[in-house]
Amino acid sequence: MSTKTKPQKPNIIKPLLGSVREYKKPSVITPIFMAVEAFCECLIPWFAGRLITTIQANGDKLMQSIFMYGGILLALAICSLLSGVLAGRFAATASCGFAKNLRHDLFYKVQKFSFANVDKFSSSSLVTRLTTDVTNVQQSYQMCLRIAIRVPLQFLFAIIMSFLTNPKLAWIFVAIIPFLAGALILIMRVAMPFFRRIFKKYDALNNSVQENVGGIRVVKSFVREEYEKEKFDKAAREVRDDFTKAEKIIAFNNPIMTLAINVAAVLISVLSAYAIIDADFWAAFDGYKIGSFTTDGFGIGQLSTLISYGIQMLSCLMMFSMIFVMLSMSLESARRISEVLVTESDLASPENGVKEVKDGSICFKNVNFKYSAAANKYALSDIDLEIKSGETVGILGGTGSSKTTLIQLIPRLYDATDGEVLVGGENVKNYDLDTLRKEVAVVLQKNVLFSGTIKENLRWGDENATDEELERVCKLAQADEFIRSFPDGYDTYIEQGGTNVSGGQKQRLCIARALLRKPKILILDDSTSAVDTKTDALIRHAFAEEIPNTTKIIIAQRVSSVEHADKILILDGGKIIANGNHETLMKTSEIYRETYEAQTKGKTSQQSEGGEA
């Protein structure tokens, strides 16, 4: 009979502990000081009770005893204070350092992700994990170092000291523990599902904010402010509603704790009062006798001590419930962070990967590709293509024809599902990723500029580039003229996302940045769509003259952008349906011919009208 092994749950905490690193020392020292503080706190009621008993007895050495016990209490209070302060300092150092390392590790992990990994986590979700989730885990880590160490120790000390004071009455405190534990577990079992939903709705809330802020110009141009407000309010209400439901359940926690301890305190007070008044009160309970309980051995001092320990236990239980709630919330945050940390990049550099790309030749051999193994349909099918080094290749196709998908396989942003992609005669999987991507510069559809000067943005291509090199590539990209029109020229500050430059200017800056890398392969993914046809032609002419040995792949919607290419590909439904130069395709491809004629008809008509005038 075969036995099926249950899949093991992933360890949530272990991936996070690796971020403690250099903060192990303060993480170990903090609990030591907390243990000292807890021990001192538990000795104070004991000696306070002895002091009360001494005063009550009114013996010959009363003042001497008062000074002795008073001195001990003062020393314990100072020791407790210093231990608490030092524990707080070390805990703050450890938790803040841990959070810093955790954010560092998360951010670096995301930087290593492939496009497929990034597709798995939405950008809003990653932002939440790097901010809110890390903050939750940081607070819980600090709480664990301090309160989570102190509470069980102080509770244990208080129980022990209660039994040393009077075993019979101490059992009353012990008896309420199972009731309180059961109530706490029940409360958290009901509340936890709400916390899971809350974090998912936090992602939706952040996504709403990101979309709105990123597309604020579109929102305003379409007068959609009210719709966006309603969408945001809905997301905010959902977070509020789930938080409210969870808090309503957790609200039972403290009252239940307080009630139980107060009942115990009342019982102890009543029984102690009877015992103090009547020495024979416990005679009826001789069968259950655990320790001596007489007026000679028990008095107001011992009663005060027991009540103090009861208050300490109440405080410990309430703090424990608070820790339990906080840890339950942060456990979901820890799970989300751990999910990112344990996710391995789908694409990794091989050991001893090839460190040099010989040339800009590209070859696709029987390539098929789909974005996930579960997908029913291939995004690319039966791709066989050969591009010689230095060739210019144009790619045309309708929306959704997988033009961008095709070029993303070249710098290995994705791996082909079937077949091989070769660059410089070598399978892209054999290259060191950094080496390959330095030689394949891609200007994507979505042009991204970062906050900083134009020079700083351009030097993403080559951080050691001289000013002369910057000017050269900007002239090739037809960007030099408009840059010099700015008052600060190349030192002009670019706002986040490039919001203070036009779409065409942004595209040309991104092209210049790519050229600065001096790549063997340059890919422009519809990267001149926002420039006029004259500027587009100037860019293409500059490429032909200045970088003839660079393989150039141009994805475009305008036939004029690719008609002078050595080779033009027509994609439809993820397949290459036509391949040839302009003259060949005009004869053999009806789609190309119709597209060309449709795009040039208006221009021809205008020229004819101009000739007749």
Feature names for model-found ranges:
Residues 9, 32-33, 40-53, 76-123, ...:
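Juxtamembrane helix-loop junctions of ABC transporter transmembrane domains
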Residues 62, 71, 161-175, 245-336, ...:
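Helix-loop-helix
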Residues 22, 26-37, 50, 82, ...:
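Transmembrane helices of ABC transporter permease
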Residues 26-27, 76-95, 146-153, 174-201, ...:
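Alpha-helical transmembrane segments of multi-pass membrane proteins
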Residues 355-613:
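ABC-type nucleotide-binding domain
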Residues 2-7, 96, 104-128, 132-134, ...:
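Short intracellular "coupling" helices and adjacent cytoplasmic loop segments at the cytosolic face
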Residues 1-41, 48, 55-73, 87-91, ...:
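Membrane-integrated ABC transporters
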Residues 21-25, 112-116, 132-145, 149, ...:
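An intracellular "coupling" helix at the cytosolic face of ABC transporter transmembrane type-1 domains
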